[in-house]
Amino acid sequence: MASEKSTSKGQAWFCTTGLPSDIEIEVDDMTFHLHKFPLMSKSRKLHRLITEQETRSSSSMALITVIDPKVEETDKKGKGHEIEDDKEEEEVEEQEIEENGYPHIKLEDFPGSSESFEMVAKFCYGVKMDLSASTVVPLRCAAEHLEMTEEYSPDNLISKTERFLSHSVYKSLRESIKALKACESVSPLAGSLGITEQCIDSIVSRASSADPSLFGWPVNDGGGRGNISATDLQLIPGGAAKSRKKPSRDSNMELWFEDLTQLSLPIFKTVILSMRSGDLSSDIIESCLICYAKKHIPGILRSNRKPPSSSSTAVSENEQRELLETITSNLPLDKSSISSTTRFLFGLLRTAIILNAAEICRDLLERKIGSQLERATLDDLLVPSYSYLNETLYDVDLVERILGHFLDTLEQSNTAIVEVDGKSPSLMLVGKLIDGFLAEIASDANLKSDKFYNLAISLPDQARLYDDGLYRAVDVYLKAHPWVSEAEREKICGVMDCQKLTLEACTHAAQNERLPLRAVVQVLFFEQLQLRHAIAGTLLAAQSPSTSQSTEPRPSAAIRNLTITEEDGDEAEGERQVDAGKWKKTVRENQVLRLDMDTMRTRVHRLERECSNMKKVIAKIDKEGSSPATTTDRPRSWSITKKFGCKFKTQVCDSHEATMVDHRSRRS
């Protein structure tokens, strides 16, 4: 029988054995013209159905003739319609048997599709089948439904499919995922047979032994490693060689994430729960959730927003909300080891706000983001205000809540923080990030001063090494809100620490007309203090030439001592060489300071000469002003004053006086 062939014509399937068919079996919309003996020899259920069909067809004529007309009229008042329906079905079967010469059986609850029954028929005829992970599951369920057991016939279909599942499917991660996908069409029977559970167990066990270095790829904007350009690979040491050496292994390992995205949400949820109960790495679980969310939630990443293809099925808002809450509830609570996960979490949060997800879902996302806020970018923080209650362009309250979660996490994990000079690197990164966010939202005309002030002071003092970024945000806010009162201006400027402003920021602030007078005075005071410290340090270094000259021969003496005591050991020699090098560096710095001081003296003398010349010119102008032609010569004197840069009342001080007035303070 192995040489027998099958053909399909429209909605009918024929077995071309040279013998006429003697039975019809209908599955879905397909009618199979087959032979009784091959089917009855392998399937107990088909044997029973065919026997019952033949018995019923042979006795149906006698049953019809025995019926009394009076009884029929009486039954019509109660159950007459049911008898008529049975009679009609029997008449249809008799008509089919009379027309075709063989019975017709319709399998109503057959698991799988007509393709599965076609494979069953081929097995009954002895035709070789090509099994796969996608076809073996419905075929196993069909064999169970048709009672194709080993007791009924040796080497039957149930044992054949079980062997294939054990030897080929359960031993492979990707094959187990494909088989699990096939379980969806026959889920009740596949679950009762244990196929679904065994596939999930295989996935969990195989995933735990996979390469953990590959679990970072789903969160990348491109979605995989295949988007890395050749130039980027050349920048990685050995990257091009590694990509040429093992392309197939990496691609195969990455594809099982994509296979998981083909599962339906209920089965995928079961897989994730099994992974969590199996103590799998949080990176594996998180990568699976990220890849599944990117596949089924459109527009979750700003940089990867593509129009949906015609082949993709539209997902309703309720389904997206359910999926989003499932993804969020299963995310690991601990900090992710994948830095780019933060952008994905912000995308989830934006989608949760748009879909009006549950409050607990949004709170979980905010806490998760807060635990790794130092990895965020300014673009991540710019979440639009989707609520009509917020007048601002961006959701400032959201950022304030996330920042609060970050500070709580930082306080709870003091032992895990590596501090440098008493400052936390994570805290300083967040401080720079918040300053950038403040500068971005400061131009919003609807931003209240209290909200700006509260967000600016929410960070501790050690979060900022310099307050230049905060000053920039304050300046932008005052420029965009000219109607703010003087008291509010002073309050907003109070968020800055003028001692943390750099010299460039102090110079700009001293000339800033938008700052209140109190703030300008503070800036000028600390700017003058910085200049005094700088000048004092330069003078102290320059006023000790005798000390440096008297100690200049020391390097040669130290070198002679080093040559004499070479045999004292390698350690002593190394220390002395280091001391000699430090001494040479110190002498060189002193020489540079002397040169700088000489240059400064030269500039001071030149300024004194210019000042004396200006005094003479001004005195000459004053003498000419006493003549009657003063009114006519005023434009000339004004031009001379402008020529020498005297915008205000001229005040010249001697460089040898104890107090010097900075020219920037006069411009303020």
Swiss-Prot record:
SUPFAM superfamilies: POZ domain (SSF54695)
Pathway entry: Protein modification; protein ubiquitination
One Pfam family cited in the UniProt record for this chain: NPH3
Phosphotyrosine: residues carrying this PTM: 471
Protein name: BTB/POZ domain-containing protein At5g66560
InterPro entries named among the record's database cross-references: BTB/POZ_dom (IPR000210), NPH3/RPT2-like (IPR043454), NPH3_dom (IPR027356), SKP1/BTB/POZ_sf (IPR011333)
Highest taxon above the source species: Eukaryota
Positions with biased composition (Acidic residues): 85-98
Domain NPH3: 254-530
Keywords for this protein: Phosphoprotein, Ubl conjugation pathway
Skewed-composition ranges (Basic and acidic residues): 73-84
PANTHER family, per database record: OS12G0117600 PROTEIN
Entry function: May act as a substrate-specific adapter of an E3 ubiquitin-protein ligase complex (CUL3-RBX1-BTB) which mediates the ubiquitination and subsequent proteasomal degradation of target proteins.
Record region (Disordered): 73-98
Every BTB domain range: 21-133
Any GO BP annotation: protein ubiquitination
Species this protein is from: Arabidopsis thaliana
Domain description: The BTB/POZ domain mediates the interaction with some component of ubiquitin ligase complexes.
